[in-house]
Each structure stands twice: as C-alpha cells, then as structure tokens.
C-alpha cells in the first residue's frame, strides 16, 4: 500500500501508478483509488507540542495549508489557475460554458444510469436511520443558470469562480486494473 498526498489528484495518481506497475510487469492486477474527506480537515495549532511562548499563536486550516497553497509564495493554488487563464486566453464566458456543460453531462449520466453498473452503493448508519449513497451529490447542487453571475473566487478581477474550480467535498473511488495477459 502507498499513500499519495495530492489532494484531488491522489486517486488519479494512484491509477497512474497502478498502470505503470502493470506495464512494467511488477503486477498483473492492481486495486487503485483514493479518498478524501475535506469536510474533516482539521485546523492546526503549530508549535503547540513544543510549547508556545509568550504571545498569540496562529491556527492554520490544514486543507488550505497542506494542499491548496503554494509552499513557496503562500498563494492559493487558484491563483495559478488564473495565471493559466491569462497565459492561454480563456475567457470567463468559455469557463462558464465549460462548467455548465460539465454539470449537465454529469446530471445526464446520473439520470440515464450510464455508470450505475460501476457504482457500489455505500450505506451509512446514523441515529436517524440508514443513509445510502449511490451517486455524486455535487452536480445536483449546482444551479446552472447562476453560473454567469458568480463572483471570482481567487482574484478580485479574476475569471475563475466556484463553478469553474474544484469543490470542497468528500469522495472516494477505487478501480480494479488488470493485465490482458
């Protein structure tokens, strides 16, 4: 087992490693995937174990600090998205259209059952009873009509919004990869 800490990219990177192992002949069958629970990311009180001396101590958001902030200049990773937008000339309208189409495709896939055979429902017992999860809740939360009205998320005069960037949520997926031989 290997742990990969790449925030949203961890699962995809695990699948890439699995592919590489099969291609190299190190494995014939690999289970690869990832999970994250961003809603459970803690806040950190740095230096609390060794003793905070006189004065105040800063509390850090672990989710932002450990994965969504550039360690060198302390800028949000969203700012780098804005730099790519500027470099490649993506307009706000293009980003909004892509976000809307992405959500619509996800909704269409859910409604048609396109991936139903590939999804294993997960049931969680709560005080209020069992809750079954068998589809991504995120696409249904989006009001496609509001996408063009959203404010920029990372720069005051930016073009990337909550609709055209990754959401903060929890999720998990696993795939079985195998060699044809």
Tell me what each language-model feature is.
Residues 9, 39-40, 48, 103, ...:
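Short secondary-structure boundary/hinge segments and terminal tails
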Residues 65-66, 82, 86, 157-162:
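Flexible glycine/proline-enriched surface loops and loop-helix/loop-strand junctions
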Residues 19, 29-83:
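Flexible glycine-/small-residue-enriched beta->alpha junction loops
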């Amino acid at each position: 087992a290997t742990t990969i800490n790449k925030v949203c990219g961890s699962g995809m990177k695990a699948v890439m490693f699995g592919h590489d192992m099969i291609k190299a002949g190190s494995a014939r069958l690999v289970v690869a995937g990832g999970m994250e629970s961003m809603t459970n990311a803690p806040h950190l009180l740095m230096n609390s174990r060794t003793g905070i001396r006189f004065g105040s101590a800063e509390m850090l958001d672990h989710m932002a600090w450990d994965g969504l902030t550039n360690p060198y200049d302390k800028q949000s990773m969203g700012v780098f998205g804005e730099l790519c937008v500027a470099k490649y000339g993506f307009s706000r309208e293009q980003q909004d259209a892509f976000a809307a189409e992405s959500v619509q495709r996800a909704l269409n896939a859910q409604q048609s059952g396109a991936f139903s055979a590939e999804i294993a429902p997960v049931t969680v017992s709560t005080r209020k009873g069992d809750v079954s999860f068998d589809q991504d809740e995120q696409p249904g939360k989006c009001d496609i009509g509001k996408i063009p009205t959203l404010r920029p998320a990372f720069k005051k005069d930016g073009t990337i919004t909550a609709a055209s960037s990754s959401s903060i949520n929890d999720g998990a997926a696993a795939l079985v990869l195998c060699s044809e031989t």
